[in-house]
Amino acid sequence: MSQKVANRSIVFYNSQSPPSVITEELDLGNCFSPSELVVKIHAAALNPVDFLLQGFAYSWLVGKGPKGFSRDYSGEVVKVGANVKDFKVGDKVSGLFQHLYGKQGTLCDYLILDPSKQPAISKISPVGHPEYDDYVINASWALVFGTAYQALHNYGQNLGPDSKVLVIGASTSVSNALIQIAKNRMKIGTVVGICSKKSFEYNKKLGYDYLAAYDDGSTVENVKQIMKNNMGNEKFDLIFDSVGNSEFFECINDVLKDKCQNSHYVSVTGDKKLNYSNPRIRDSLPGWESIRRIGPFRKYNYKLLLLKPEATFAKIGSEMIAQKQFVPAVDSVYAFEDYSKAFERLKSNKAKGKVVIQISQ
């Protein structure tokens, strides 16, 4: 029996094309395989990486067809294949849909996925947020939470009450998730954040033990003063960079423990702050500092984190939200028809939390 519906998607075609809406007919009766399910999307969050990928979307490299935006989503399962075991029609779910220049993104009415290939999906629990509904909150966290979780867990470190972590870019959405995981779940003893002076009060409430300003004197010296005055000059077990920074490399031995102690410097962007609105390939290339990270020249443990979609972080994130241990940060919510305003908000670099587009209510 035909169950045809209209499926709207926000897409781009290449690096020069503006975002646009396409509408295609989708037959819910036969659009999925036995191993797939169909999610009716209620909300999806924007991520800066989408603009970066579009900036590099040269037609000769990625083809001329439509390419979907976004990865975070929340919604309701409306169809389930015969071989899908863990989900049923009516389940409210959220997750991360990983793709690279695929036609399907999450800014659409219906998302078709195979949970065995897209494992970062979990059932959502009631949130009870005073301002936003459950779908908005649950659309806002998978990518940033997963990134933060893997930064803290994927490199063989056993971080806990005696550990010390430095967060470069304390006000980003990824760092917002990281501080909540670090303090509320892992009970990490000392977390120092770097942010603007005006963000001190906000970040202190999240759980940072000490904050260093990047807009008041030398960032490096401000951190060293915290180490001297509050940490007994002990060095960090982990330096996490969520913005793109190179200030600490010249004095890495002064701030990061020796590599033999399994200390790590983990970055999600590289050594430079990327211009997501106008990305350039040369800004993404490794610099001379990379020589100190490889082979016999390696002076410290460095990782450029590329998020892997995993069921583990999706399950833990959902549990922490239900237990009030993690509150995703939402900056603003826009209707589907106002997607261009949502894009501009994210590009403004003024968003404090995720920018979410509500697909259906």
Swiss-Prot record:
Its main location: other. Belongs to the YIM1 family. It is found in: Lipid droplet; Mitochondrion. One of its GO terms (cellular component) is lipid droplet. GO terms for molecular function: oxidoreductase activity. It comes from Lachancea thermotolerans (strain ATCC 56472 / CBS 6340 / NRRL Y-8284). Keywords: Lipid droplet, Mitochondrion. This is Protein YIM1-2. It comes from the Eukaryota. InterPro entries: ADH-like_N (IPR013154), GroES-like_sf (IPR011032), NAD(P)-bd_dom_sf (IPR036291), PKS_ER (IPR020843), YIM1/Zinc_Alcohol_DH_Fams (IPR050700). Gene3D superfamilies: Medium-chain alcohol dehydrogenases, catalytic domain, NAD(P)-binding Rossmann-like Domain. It holds the Pfam family ADH_zinc_N_2.
